[in-house]
Amino acid sequence: DSLCGRRVLTSEFVRGRKLTMVLDEHHQRGDQEAVSGILHALLDAWFRQVLVGGVFQADPHPGNLMVDDDGRVVVLDFGCTMTLPEAYRRGYFRVLQAAIVGERTVIAETLAELGFATRSGRPDTLLAFTDALLDQIRVAMVETGAAGTQWPGPEALMEQVRALLIRMEDDPVEKIPAEFVMLARVFGTLGGLFLHYQPRLDIGRLVLRYLTMPETLGDTPRQAATPEPLPWWQRWGLVPRAEL
């Protein structure tokens, strides 16, 4: 980390194999536990980047993801990285909280504060968009438990898309923050992996951990303890090899 700074990003060579190659091998052997473990680590990593660090790698296509010889997920190429202003980090976290408990008024108000707007000014399209993105998490929190999340199949997914397109034709979204465009890109890419491999994950337990973290709730000032910016690997929740 001593080689990295505000203007310098230092790379290292890491041995590993392409993530999808490893997942395919586990899937063909019927090792669903291994598939689920890898994808759990992947989702956990991006939740931590976005909700805790406020900095995330914004290009997680399969070519930028590997699994090393120890089974750890490796993220390559931090050239496309997005930093969320603190108000946006807190705002998206508040939307997640409100979506889980069904507080639609809070969702609408928070999205307006973040800069989202429809042509009419009504929140209906924004709420439908939020439902499409977060309903899977909400259902996992209240229904599935440790048995694992049931991911939608192609038909259910297309029905969601059709309903959203109809809503957007009626009252399109005309203002979307740039940060959200990158977030949607990230979780849309990751979502493709989950829909394809159908891992059995306890999403509720994972999300609950972030809902109760002091770092995400803002109870612990993240900047006050260190006048200088934290090393990038700490902000993204990564562990240096020396500490393993």
For each feature predicted by the language model, list its residue ranges.
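Helix-rich C-lobe and terminal helical cap/extension of kinase-like folds
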Residues: 2-5, 14-16, 24-41, 68-244
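Conserved ATP-binding subdomain of kinase catalytic cores across diverse folds
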Residues: 1-20, 53, 57
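Hydrophobic residue at the +6 position relative to the catalytic HRD Asp in the kinase catalytic loop
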Residues: 63-67
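Conserved kinase catalytic-core helix
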Residues: 30-58
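C-terminal structured domain segments across diverse proteins
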Residues: 49, 57-62, 147-151
